[in-house]
Amino acid sequence: RAKVAQTKKKKWDTCFKYGSLLTTLSQGYMLGIWVTGLRTDLYAQGFALLSAFGVTAAYAFIGACWLILKTEGDLQRKAIYWAKRCLSILAGGIIAVSFLNLTLHEEVRALWLESSLGIVLMAIPITCFGLLALCGGVLQRLPEAGGKGEWLPFALALLVFLLCFAAFGISYYPYIVPGQLTIMDALADANSLRFLLVGTVIVVPCILAYTVMVYRIFAGK
């Protein structure tokens, strides 16, 4: 985009926007299908579509919070507005997905509502919505002079993401395909696992190093 003629930049912007939208909708849809155990009935499709819009709102929310941290002026004010809108959609999506999730798998419902860990696990959604409420309060006060508090929305968004990931992990462990395939069932031959381990040891540090480098390049406003 940076190297094309000015008259073509808008087309590139459109491609980036709709490409990103398609990617997030697809990721959310596939997550929803995975949660249902790869079902294809109407109920599962509806849940997957809800998941698609919820994941898109989540990405838009954390992206807007990142812009609040990295920008100033008119763009920052727009980012604050976007974050407020997306926060409401995200909160509604989390509530809907959480309740529907309990209807999909008996094991998940029993874990959250009937097991001895239920009270402890309920701390996750309570904390999650507490963080969203706190983030909403912070967004109402922004922007403040001197950039005070502009880092808080992104930090709170990260915590919300981590809690949602934790809830999913706890709910569906040890399944790779919920209700059908466990980690132990899917284990490959020991030699194959050793090969994957070597690749992981090489690739993961490279990804982390690249991520750190990118954050350093784009540090500051």
Residue ranges and their predicted role:
Residues V177-L196:
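Short, membrane-exposed interhelical loops at transmembrane-helix boundaries
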